[in-house]
């Protein structure tokens, strides 16, 4: 399993109504730190697929959700459980930090 791309249009069905906790990575193509954590999130997605969904949301292509959730810098990771925002992490970090944060 790889990370899932989410858009403004499918955010509710793919994130808010998900049956598992969902980590959403708000990112952009031009963002260097976003490119750093991309492969890390792919690894986590593969290793923890039974526990959590890892989703990516491109803020340039789909700006509505980033505005709604007050994303001001990227990468920003938001963790949703049961349709509610539970935690926020801003900036690139290590795999072990992301896993323990989840």
Regions inferred by a protein language model and the residue ranges of each:
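Non-catalytic, surface beta->alpha helical segment in thiol-disulfide oxidoreductase systems
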Residues: 73, 78-102
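Conserved Rossmann-like nucleotide-binding pocket used by diverse enzymes
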Residues: 2, 7, 27, 55
């Amino acid at each position: 399993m790889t990370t899932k791309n989410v858009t403004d249009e499918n955010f509710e069905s793919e994130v808010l109504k998900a049956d598992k906790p969902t980590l959403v990575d708000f990112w952009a193509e031009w963002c260097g730190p976003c490119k750093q954590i991309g492969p890390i999130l792919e690894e986590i997605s593969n290793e923890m697929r039974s526990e959590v969904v890892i989703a990516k949301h491109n803020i340039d292509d789909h700006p509505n959700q980033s505005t709604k959730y007050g994303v001001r810098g990227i990468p920003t990771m938001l963790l949703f459980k049961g349709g509610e925002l539970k935690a926020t992490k801003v900036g690139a970090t290590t795999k072990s930090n992301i896993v323990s944060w989840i």
